[in-house]
């Protein structure tokens, strides 16, 4: 075990504070509509330009181990805010820096760090309660567009795309962001359920121009196993022929004589049929087939349930108003499933999303949820250069998460004003002793930091702006740094999602309180000389050889 270096008290906190400042100062220049860009060097390819706080924070790694510990803890604030609300990362970083700075001074003046922490916790509770009380529900598309515009650093086009996407796929629908190959940004909406499997054979195609299978009012057979034996399929095929309706078979695979017979019947026109491989693998495939069954009002045929293929009846099949299958995707529109069944399945998937610890599983569950709940919207972000597209995509991602958060918990006035107003409530908090009172005061001072920083980034005097805003007693009154005017921020469309502001202050205070209560730090000693160990002096040639 290598030797360690240990720092105590003021020395430890000073080194840590230096790291916090380096990271926070790099991140906070991006805050607000007039925030600046940060250029990130990449080991390969062109540098990356971004205005996204968490992207900047993730790139920062400091040489000094003690400074780096401070920086990494504040980086955690940005990451946690991004995970919980998808935005507010810069605000959270600015708040954490302000609380740590004021808290550090209080500890250096001889106050009890644990009482300071209790005071900070009391203050945060009061701030959250005030935010929730003054939160306003988002109802119109205009408000959704405004939230998107603010979060995308004032880009009106992005706000409009997001509100259109949410209008089309609903609040539960999935919105994915991709890089476009063109200059224009565009929105593409897939209604109904789509999965990434196409037809097994091109002979099933009904629309030769588009190379697509298009069926109206179709039956859907959902089978977990391979189908190769014709005899087990025959009873069902005969029953479907009698109805005159088309049949879509979703199975692990269709091969051999079963596939040959389906193709021949399709070509002769005796049976409108198409076969598709089941999506996913393993347990996920089972779950997705069950989703399709619930959406279409059918039953997933599985040997686990003791149902044999030859015993399948028309009542076990799903139904859909329209099914489209191309080479790569299958889309089922207007399935005949019962609304109550679909809602129960949606609730079940939501519960799984809450429980899972894996990001990959969460992403896949959210995709399944969207397919059941409404559809998928894809925003393809365009731009003149790859660097511009990447920078814009970062902003669209932020804006998408912010609009989701706004729909979930409502909105408050933006520009750091909601936190400024909450700071006025902290004067009334009762504490047990003076140190706790100082803890509350630390948070009260820190709450003006985001509004101050937005003004500074716009070239204004932060203290003057904060003073003028607090003079007026209207909750929504604030400073619009884009135009340099004061007024009702909600009417001007300058709004923040309550969830974003709430998670920013909670995460910032949580990590900052830990930094304030730190008394010792332990890190490995830097290696002396920097040479790798291993070879003895003198080259270490083979014994007995004289070169």
Curated annotation (Swiss-Prot):
Give me the disulphide-bonded residues.
none
Q: Which GO terms describe its cellular component?
A: cytoplasm
InterPro entries attached here?
Chaperonin_Cpn60_CS, Cpn60/GroEL, Cpn60/GroEL/TCP-1, GroEL-like_apical_dom_sf, GROEL-like_equatorial_sf, TCP-1-like_intermed_sf
Provide the primary localization. Answer: cytoplasm
| Broad class of enzyme this protein falls into | isomerase
Q: Does the keyword Chaperone apply?
A: yes
Do the record's keywords include Isomerase?
yes
Give the E.C. number(s): 5.6.1.7
Alphabetically sorted, this entry's keywords are:
ATP-binding, Chaperone, Cytoplasm, Isomerase, Nucleotide-binding
GO MF, one annotated term: unfolded protein binding
Q: Which Pfam families does its entry note?
A: Cpn60_TCP1
Q: Which reaction does it catalyse?
A: ATP + H2O + a folded polypeptide = ADP + phosphate + an unfolded polypeptide
Tell me, which GO biological process terms does this entry list? Answer: protein refolding
According to the lineage, what is the superkingdom? Bacteria
Q: Which residues bind ATP?
A: 30-33, 51, 87-91, 415, 496
Compartment annotation: Cytoplasm
The cross-references to PANTHER family, in alphabetical order and at most eight, read:
60 KDA HEAT SHOCK PROTEIN, MITOCHONDRIAL (PTHR45633)
Which purpose does this protein serve, as stated in its record?
Answer: Together with its co-chaperonin GroES, plays an essential role in assisting protein folding. The GroEL-GroES system forms a nano-cage that allows encapsulation of the non-native substrate proteins and provides a physical environment optimized to promote and accelerate protein folding.
Homology family: Belongs to the chaperonin (HSP60) family.
Its assembly, as annotated, is: Forms a cylinder of 14 subunits composed of two heptameric rings stacked back-to-back. Interacts with the co-chaperonin GroES.
Q: What is the recorded name of this protein?
A: Chaperonin GroEL 1
Gene label? groEL1
């Amino acid at each position: 075990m290598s030797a360690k270096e240990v720092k105590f008290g003021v020395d430890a906190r000073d080194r840590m504070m230096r790291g916090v400042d380096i990271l926070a100062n790099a991140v906070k220049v991006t805050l607000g509509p007039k925030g600046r860009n940060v250029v990130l060097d990449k080991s390969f390819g062109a540098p990356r330009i971004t205005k996204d706080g968490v992207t900047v924070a993730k790139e920062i790694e400091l040489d000094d181990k003690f400074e780096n510990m401070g920086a990494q803890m504040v980086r955690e604030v940005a990451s946690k805010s991004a995970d919980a609300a998808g935005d507010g990362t810069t605000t959270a970083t600015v708040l954490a820096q302000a609380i740590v700075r004021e808290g550090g001074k209080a500890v250096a003046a001889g106050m009890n760090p644990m009482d300071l922490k209790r005071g900070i916790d009391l203050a945060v509770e009061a701030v959250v309660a005030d935010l929730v009380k003054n939160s306003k529900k988002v109802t119109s598309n205009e408000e959704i567009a405004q939230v998107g515009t603010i979060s995308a650093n004032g880009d009106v086009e992005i706000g409009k795309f997001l509100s259109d996407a949410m209008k089309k796929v609903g609040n539960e629908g999935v919105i994915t962001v991709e890089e476009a190959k063109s200059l224009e940004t565009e929105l593409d909406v897939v209604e109904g359920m789509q999965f990434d499997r196409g037809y097994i054979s091109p002979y099933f195609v009904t629309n030769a121009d588009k190379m697509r299978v298009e069926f109206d009012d179709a039956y859907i057979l959902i089978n977990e196993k391979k189908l190769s034996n014709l005899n087990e399929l025959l009873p069902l095929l005969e029953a479907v022929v009698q109805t005159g309706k088309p049949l879509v078979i979703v199975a692990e695979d269709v091969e051999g004589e079963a596939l040959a017979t389906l193709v021949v019947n399709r070509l002769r026109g005796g049976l409108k049929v198409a076969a598709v491989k089941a999506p996913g693998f393993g347990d996920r495939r089972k779950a997705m087939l069950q989703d399709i069954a619930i959406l279409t009002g059918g039953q997933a045929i599985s040997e686990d349930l003791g149902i044999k293929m030859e015993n399948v009846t028309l009542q076990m099949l799903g139904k859909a108003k329209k099914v489209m299958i191309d080479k790569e995707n299958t889309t089922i529109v207007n399935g005949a499933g019962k609304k109550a069944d679909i809602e129960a399945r949606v609730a079940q998937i939501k519960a799984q999303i809450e429980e899972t610890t894996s990001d990959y599983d969460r992403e896949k569950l959210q995709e399944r949820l969207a397919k059941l709940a409404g559809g998928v919207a894809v925003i393809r972000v365009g731009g003149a250069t790859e660097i511009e597209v990447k920078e814009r995509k970062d902003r669209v991602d932020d804006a998408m998460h912010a609009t989701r958060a706004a729909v979930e918990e409502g909105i408050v006035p933006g520009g750091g004003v909601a936190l400024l107003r909450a700071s006025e409530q902290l004067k009334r908090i009762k504490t047990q002793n003076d140190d706790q009172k100082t803890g509350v005061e630390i948070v009260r001072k820190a709450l003006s930091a985001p509004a101050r920083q937005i003004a500074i980034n716009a070239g204004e005097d932060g203290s003057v702006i904060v003073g003028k805003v607090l003079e007026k007693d209207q909750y929504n009154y604030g400073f619009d740094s884009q135009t340099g005017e004061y007024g009702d921020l909600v009417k001007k469309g300058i709004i923040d999602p309550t969830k974003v502001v709430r998670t920013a202050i909670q995460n910032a205070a949580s990590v900052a309180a830990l930094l304030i209560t730190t008394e010792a730090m332990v890190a490995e000693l830097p290696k002396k000389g920097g040479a790798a160990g291993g070879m003895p002096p003198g080259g270490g040639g083979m014994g007995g050889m004289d070169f």
